[in-house]
A protein has these predicted regions:
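Phosphate- and other anionic-substrate recognition elements at nucleic-acid/protein interfaces
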Residues: 1-159
């Protein structure tokens, strides 16, 4: 069974674990939204990624379930909600089972509650040194989050 971990949002990421090992991690595919400099999730490319990885209804998609955050603003939350909906829609179209996990659950499992965003990147590099080149920049913390979301399911529910 493959486990897909998704950190949703425009700056999010997608990871795939096979037997507990990372087989793929990429930034969330995006595209321009109209003529503005804003971005949106590229649903077609997300579909391509999941299809190329041979993700099927026998696998699991673990999607971080987030809610409104103080100070984010209405426009930002609406945009985030759209991104979340696109991800769920792609998974539904591909008939992939989606399991939602709250950030507090997976972060607590890895002792990352109230830690810096970059702590997840450090944790993944310690656990999977072979992936360090994929996580060399601070912005790669979202990739690390996607990996840990999948790993959380693997360690707690997916065995």
């Amino acid at each position: 069974m493959k486990i897909v971990g998704i950190d949703p949002g425009i700056s999010g990421a997608i990871s795939v674990l096979r037997d507990g090992n990372i087989s793929m991690v990429v930034d969330m595919p995006t595209m321009a939204e109209g003529t503005k400099s804003k971005k949106q999730i590229n649903a077609a490319e997300l579909t391509n990624i999941l299809t190329k990885e041979n993700i099927s209804h026998e696998d699991k998609v673990i999607l971080e379930s987030v809610s409104a955050m103080p100070g984010q603003g209405v426009t930002g939350m609406f945009s985030f909600g759209q991104s979340f909906g696109v991800i769920k829609g792609v998974c539904a179209a591909l008939k992939l089972p989606v399991i939602l996990v709250r950030p507090v659950k997976w972060k607590k499992h890895f002792n990352l509650l109230n830690s810096e965003k970059d702590a997840s990147r450090t944790k993944v590099i310690e656990t999977y040194p072979y992936i360090s080149s994929e996580l060399s920049k601070k912005k790669d913390a979202n990739k690390a989050d996607a990996i840990l979301i999948a790993k959380y399911y693997f360690e707690t529910l997916g065995k």
